[in-house]
Amino acid sequence: MTKSELIEKLATRQSQMSAKEVESAIKEMLEQMAQTLEGGDRIEIRGFGSFSLHFRAPRTGRNPKTGTSVDLDGKYVPHFKPGKELRERVDAINA
């Protein structure tokens, strides 16, 4: 599901909000989440999951075109850990 598909689906389910209001709310929520992670903080949505930053240590990589070794710097990457409720709902699909 893309962001525009999510907005469309929510707009049809929320008759009290216009599609533009739903779009604005989604964009603002995503922006706030990005700013929170950018500040190094963790986001926890109970039952859904948590977003945090994980550090990837410096390593030696390989340029896929040339095959030469390339030193890669350490960096922080966004990480999502599903919550118990979400994990159980997804697991129920496989049962």
Swiss-Prot record:
Any single GO BP term: regulation of DNA-templated transcription
InterPro entries in the cross-refs: Hist_DNA-bd, Histone-like_DNA-bd_CS, IHF-like_DNA-bd_dom_sf, IHF_beta
PROSITE patterns in UniProt: HISTONE_LIKE
Top-level taxon of the source organism: Bacteria
CDD domains, A to Z: IHF_B
Keywords: DNA recombination, DNA-binding, Transcription, Transcription regulation, Translation regulation
GO CC terms, sorted: chromosome; cytosol
Subunit note: Heterodimer of an alpha and a beta chain.
Similarity-based family: Belongs to the bacterial histone-like protein family.
Purpose: This protein is one of the two subunits of integration host factor, a specific DNA-binding protein that functions in genetic recombination as well as in transcriptional and translational control.
Name of the featured protein: Integration host factor subunit beta
Source organism per UniProt: Shewanella sediminis (strain HAW-EB3)
Gene: ihfB
